[in-house]
Amino acid sequence: MSDVICGGWTKTKKADEQTQKICENVKNQVEEEPQKNYAEFHAVEYRSQVVAGINYLIKVHVGGTNYLHLMVFHKLPCNAGQEVVTGVQEHHHKDDPLVPF
């Protein structure tokens, strides 16, 4: 039997090339509101949820001991297939769990 619950979040997985690409695509959106420029912006791990598109919850290393948790919605191809940042949490650490917010 599968551990996946329809509409539920996956378990935390190690980030891959696709996750890093999503981070690169949304980096400007993340930097806009706090007007910060992150020299480092590396996806570490993520969770996902299939809805009318895909929600991603991504842990991003931004330098030193600093991490962000990002909520990103990836639209379906019929809706332009773009990624939109729907939430950012600052002041996280390496061992903080990814909890949907």
Task: Please give the residue ranges for each predicted region.
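N- and C-terminal low-complexity/disordered segments
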Residues: M1-F101
